[in-house]
Amino acid sequence: MDEKEFKRLLRVRARLKRKKPRFLRQEWWRYPKFKNDPKWRRPKGIDSKMRLKLKGKPRSPSIGWSSPRLVRGLHPSGYEEVLIHNVKELEKLDPKRQAARIAHTVGKKKRIEILKRAQELGIKVLNPQL
């Protein structure tokens, strides 16, 4: 796939994501236990209006809401995110396709080492703040 097509697919995905609703479980507004944990759960009730896809009821996820397969799961910049814990893991990355995200357990001293080495290798770091 050429660079131009890849950029186009990223733009298509961004446009789709803007229109995509939040898929929340049925009657999430009614119970406090659902408000604190707003995950999607398929409606299975025999009289469920949401399962029947009635007008005015919340939308359900379907294959039409998904992003193009070639850019699915990528960072908005187009890189594949890889979680990094040390400099050794950083050196395994491909700078053209992958970007590093430094794990939250990494301390300040090791983070500085990782950032220096990433700059030498030309690898993009997604969370470079100290």
Curated annotation (Swiss-Prot):
GO CC annotation: cytosolic large ribosomal subunit
GO MF annotation terms: structural constituent of ribosome
Pfam families, alphabetized: Ribosomal_L32e (PF01655)
UniProt entry keywords in alphabetical sequence: Ribonucleoprotein, Ribosomal protein
Gene Ontology biological process: translation
PROSITE patterns xref list: RIBOSOMAL_L32E (PS00580)
Xref: InterPro entries: Ribosomal_eL32 (IPR001515), Ribosomal_eL32_arc (IPR023654), Ribosomal_eL32_CS (IPR018263), Ribosomal_eL32_sf (IPR036351)
SMART domains named in the record: Ribosomal_L32e
Domain of life the protein comes from: Archaea
UniProt similarity note: Belongs to the eukaryotic ribosomal protein eL32 family.
Protein name: Large ribosomal subunit protein eL32
